[in-house]
Amino acid sequence: MVDALIIDACRTPRGIGKAGKGALAGIHPQQLGATVLRALADRTGINTADVDDIIWGTSSQRGPQSGDLGRMSALDAGYDVRASGVTLDRFCGSGITSVNMAANSIMSGSEDLVIAGGTEMMSMEGRRGEGPFMMDNGNLRLRARHPQSHQGVCADAVATLEGISRHDVDALGLESQKRAALAIAGGHFNKSLVPVYREDGSLALDREEYPRPQTTMEGLSGLKPAFPAVADVPIDDKGTTYRQLILAKYPDLDITFVHHAGNSSGVVDGSAAILLASPTYAKAHGLKPRGRVVAMANMGDSPTLMLNAPVPATRKVLAKAGLTIEDIDLFEINEAFAVVAEKYIRDLELDRDKVNVNGGSIALGHPIGATGSILIGTLLDELERRDLRRGLVTMCAAGGMAPAIIIERV
């Protein structure tokens, strides 16, 4: 088996994911994806005719984000028509999965040059005009077997079951903001950031738009929990509620609501791309690798609680790599909700100074299908900046899943 080498990674800044407010909200998703694909080709000097495939993550494949966004973005970026593309959906885990699939295709010897990444325009979600989204899409047989609730209600259910308090999740949210502010001020993201321009050539965004560096613990403590109302709103003509879906599996659970906008991931727009190559191709074409993929894993857990798979996914990917927690220098666990990162740190007994060192999605935002690829690129940048060797990225995904990946510098 050959190595899957990481040649380069880039991403857009994350824009506030609200139509009429966010700087990227008026950009077509294909053009946002084209921005990073074009930048990746320019930065590395690759012949795009050599790209075997473009594997793209997009979770909300509706409207302008439908129709194989990976392929369309490549065509819009001016790639050679021989550069094929495919778009996948593993919900929040799509951006890690796209990289894992690209790495697998290279490690198997099937392909030599593959781009992975993702795009998510969350500012478009408000335009759907649909009713409450159900993971089972009305399949009552699946609902009876695996009731699946709203992600925010799941976060509060997990916090209740784990004994994680409002103070705990607020403290993690505040730390995310502090670390992100320091990272931005220190230029930690500059290596990978690609500015986004409108069709008329004017600048749309060249910096992170979502962070709130003025956040304080006092301010967070004054915010009302976001999900009590969501939990008890009827979601079908039978009056079923999101709370009832959790109680179907945990009938004695009295949910304590602790999450709000200040300790949950931000709704944003964004895109990212990562170039991977085989050693043979990289050497023949003068591409200098920055890292390699060490191991990958996927793990499922309770679909009803949804958010608990990152811990077992981490244990699985470490076992595949023959490594231990102590062998990992830095961790990126997506802050979908503060409880996810807090439980992850506690269960694995991690040093907090090694986890999400530049802040996370609470401060920076979570463009669903792109986040995993963003985190992998951010991790590689930080390993280089600190002259460290190895890092691990994982994240929860709807349906009770988590992909994971370990990378190391070369």
Q: Could you tell me what each predicted segment is?
A:
Residues 10-13, 26-35, 43, 168-279, ...:
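N-terminal extracellular/periplasmic Venus flytrap/periplasmic-binding protein-like
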Residues 27, 58-112, 133, 145-153, ...:
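Conserved catalytic cysteine-centered active-site region
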Residues 23-114, 119-137, 193-207, 304, ...:
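Conserved beta-ketoacyl condensing-enzyme motif
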Residues 10-19, 103-162, 232:
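Glycine-rich loop/linker segments at domain edges
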